[in-house]
Amino acid sequence: MQLSEWSVLLLLLKLASYIAIAGLAGTLLMRFMCGNSNVAGHQVISFYQFLKRWQITCVVTGSIAALLQVPIEAGAMAESGFMGMFDPFMLEIVWQSVIGDQATFRIPALIIALISACMWNVKSDDNVAGYKNGAVILIMLGFIAYSFTFTGHSANENGLVKSILTFHLI
């Protein structure tokens, strides 16, 4: 089997998406674990600022990967070079496939997660607001993880199998 440029691009895109989602899950886990720490205030704020930057970086990377997935898939199907990414017929085919369903499910969840990560006030003493903000990101992470069940081996499985896979991904 010969790897084309499109195959390499799609592999890199999936790798970026996986790393971004894993990074978002990791930063969220660290955020919740540090919520009850006994560390001095300024050190916690510095660490939270670090986590916030990484959350935003992960969500932006995931968003870019999700936005590029459809045109790159269309270009790979068109096999007509760079302009194949903008072929209306191929774009329509990809948007109407499970790849389009995955993108339409994942992109809004990533946008909401980005807004929530940007709105996280790390200097606030209001723990309830911080937990609500983290809960929104966690719910969006669940939606993003569920979007992975639209394609691949689990695409034809029932809801229970998809739920188990989503739980496993998180």
PLM regions: where:
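Polytopic transmembrane helical bundles with strong interfacial aromatic enrichment
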Residues: 1-170
